[in-house]
Amino acid sequence: MKRNLLISACVGFACSALPASAQISRLVHDADYAIEMSGTASSGDYAPFWLTSNRYGLSSVENNSGYVRGRVQRSTQADSTRLWRVGYGLDLAVPANYTSQAVVQQFYFDVDLRAFRLSVGAKERGESLKNAALSSGGLTQSVNARPVPQVRVELPDFWTIPGTHNWLAVKGHLAYGLFTDNRWQRETHPEGALYSANALYHSKAGFLRIGNEKKFPLSFIGGLEMSAQFGGEAWNVGRRTDDPTFDNSHVNMGHGFKSFWHAFIPGGSDAFDGAYLNNEGNQLGSWHFQLNWKGKDWNLKGYAEHFFEDHSQMFLEYGWKDMLWGVEATLPKNPFVSTVLYEHLRTTDQTGGLYHDATPELGIQISGLDNYYNHSFYGAWQHWGQAMGNPLLLSPVYNENGEIKFKHNRITAHHFGLSGQPLPELSYRLLFSHVRSLGSYEVPNIKPQFANYFMAQADYAPRHFHGLSFSAAVGSNGGSLIGNSFGGMLTLRKTGRF
C-alpha cells in the first residue's frame, strides 16, 4: 500500500512539474548567445574618439585595450504570440586596460504585458528617437556610458491611443536605479577633489506622435525627457560663501520617500544648500521635436533637442540658444549609401556667464552659469567616467588629473554620419566630427581649442559561416583638444541560438 502511494506521489509530482520544465525549456531554447573578442591599438595620448565613444561604456580611452565578452539574451519578441512575454540577458566581459578588471555589462529581466514592459536590471537601451549608429548622441541620455541598473516601467514602442484611428500614439518610461561606479570615483579623484558614492538614478520620458503614415506621409513627434541624480553621499564638496560655519567636507543626501518624490517632481533642497535653496539632487533634461516624411522607398527626418539644467532653460525665460539640430535621410535601396546624417550642436550659451540669487539689497534673480553636466554635490552627469549624455562634451575620463567634472562643456560641433551595405554580407559606417571648445565658464580656454574625430568601420558576416562576423575599424583624432592619434580596432564575434 505504501509503495503504491509512493508511486502515485512520484507520478503526480512529475506531471505537475512537467509544465514548469516545459516553460524553462522554452525560455532556454529561444535564447541567443554571443562570444566576442575585440582589441584596439593606437598612437598618441588617447585612442581614437569614435573607437571609444557611444559603445555603451564598454571601451577604453587608453592606446591599447581589449576585451573578451560572452552574453546570453532572450528578446520578449520570442513570445510574440503570448499575452505575457519574457526576456532576459546576462552579458559579461573581461577587459584589459579598462576602468575595471571585470564588467557586468548587462544583467536584466523583462516582462511584457500587452504594450507595457517591466524591466529590472542593467540593460543596453538604445536612443529613444535618434539613430544610435550614426548620431553623436542625445544630450540627456545616450548610448555612451555603461548601463545603470534600474527598475523601469515603460511603453517601449509607440502605442496608438484608442479611438484616434492611428493618428495619435504615445511612448515613455519611468525608472529608478543606482549608479555603480563608487570604486572608480574613489580611486580616480585627486586628493581633496569632489566625488560621490551610492548616488541614486531617476529617469522619465513621454513622447507624443501625431500622424498616420498610411494616410499621410508627414508625422510629428514631440516630448520631454528628464533625469536626476539624488541620494548617496558626497565628499570634499567645499565651503559655501554664505555659510562659513561648515566646510561641507562630507554630506549625506536623503534616501527617503520625499527624496524619491522630489526626483520625480523636482522640489525640496539639498543638504546644506544654505540660504539659497535649489531643487534636491541633480536635475536635467531635454525637450525633443521631430518631423518625419516617409516616401515610397525613402525617408527624411529632421529633429531638434534642447537641453536644460534648471527652470531657466526648461521654459522660455532666457530663450533656447543651445540646441542639437539634426537631419537624417534614408535613401532608396542601392549598393552605395543607405543613410546620411548631419548634426549641429551648440552648448556655449548656458543662459550666460552670470549667476546671482536675489537679495534684499539687489532683488534681481539672474539664473546663468548653468555649467552643463556638472553639479556641486554629484560632480558630473557621468557613469564610470563616460558622459551619460553627448560625448562631444568631453567626458571626465579624459581629465589627466582625475577630476570628475566636464571641463569642455561649452562647444560648437558639426557631426556627419554615413552608412551603407554594398553586399548582403558587408556593411559600413563613417563618422566625422569637428568640435570647437571654449572650455567652461568656470575655467575658460584662453583661446578656442579644436578637435577632429574620424572613424571608418566595416562589418563582414560571411554567408558560408553562419553566425560568424568580423568588424574592422580605423579612427583618428586631430587638433589640440585631446591631441593627435591614429589607430584601429578588430572584433571577432560568433552568435547563435540555443
Positions of the model-derived regions?
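Bacterial Sec-dependent N-terminal signal peptides
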Residues: 1-26, 496-498
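Short loop/turn motifs that connect adjacent beta-strands in outer-membrane beta-barrel proteins
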Residues: 23-32, 74-86, 99, 112-117, ...
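Transmembrane beta-barrel outer-membrane domains
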Residues: 59-67, 98-104, 113, 144-148, ...
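Surface-exposed strand-loop-strand hairpins of Gram-negative outer-membrane beta-barrel proteins
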Residues: 40-67, 81-84, 88, 95-99
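Surface-exposed loop and membrane-interface regions of Gram-negative outer-membrane beta-barrel proteins
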Residues: 81-111, 125-144
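Internal, well-ordered domain-core segments that constitute the primary functional module
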Residues: 125-240
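Exposed, low-structure sequence patches enriched in small/polar residues
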Residues: 218-227, 233-498
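Transmembrane beta-barrel strands of outer-membrane/channel proteins
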Residues: 31-46, 86-94, 111, 118-124, ...
